[in-house]
């Protein structure tokens, strides 16, 4: 099994698709990496030669991937929260950040409903 950026990519899939299993590589970036490395995107991972795998590793080195990318995204959110801007406060309160309504909807961000006892009439 080929190991790229610390991830075992699936053997039976085409290289173009298998690279997307690495966090930070989507289909567009996968095609770019394969073009830079000069590897045919239609071959299966199990059919890659060792030199092809080395080329792919070299081509992925120039991108921020996996743990480094997750850390970078986390630090960006933490920075927003630390400076106290609106976006940071909304992240901290687990509310939608981009101006969506919250009186109804926003269930994914706010979590499941908290039942409130009704008033007596």
UniProtKB/Swiss-Prot annotation:
Gene3D superfamilies: 1.10.8.50, 30s ribosomal protein s13, domain 2
GO biological process: translation
Region (Disordered), start-end ranges: 91-121
Regions of compositional bias (Basic residues) in chain numbering: 100-121
Gene Ontology molecular function terms on file: rRNA binding; structural constituent of ribosome; tRNA binding
Function: Located at the top of the head of the 30S subunit, it contacts several helices of the 16S rRNA. In the 70S ribosome it contacts the 23S rRNA (bridge B1a) and protein L5 of the 50S subunit (bridge B1b), connecting the 2 subunits; these bridges are implicated in subunit movement. Contacts the tRNAs in the A and P-sites.
Protein name, as recorded: Small ribosomal subunit protein uS13
Native species: Prochlorococcus marinus (strain MIT 9312)
Gene expressing this chain: rpsM
């Amino acid at each position: 099994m080929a190991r790229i950026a610390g991830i075992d990519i699936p053997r039976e899939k085409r290289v173009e698709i298998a690279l997307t299993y690495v966090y930070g590589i989507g289909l567009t970036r996968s095609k770019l990496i394969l073009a830079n490395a000069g590897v045919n995107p239609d071959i299966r991972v199990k059919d890659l030669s060792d030199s092809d795998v080395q080329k792919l590793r070299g081509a992925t080195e120039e991108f921020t991937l996996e743990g480094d990318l997750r850390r970078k995204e986390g630090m960006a959110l933490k920075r927003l929260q630390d400076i106290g801007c609106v976006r940071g406060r909304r992240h901290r309160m687990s509310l939608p950040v981009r101006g969506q309504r919250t009186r109804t909807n926003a269930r994914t961000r706010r979590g499941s409903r908290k039942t409130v006892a009704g008033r007596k009439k």
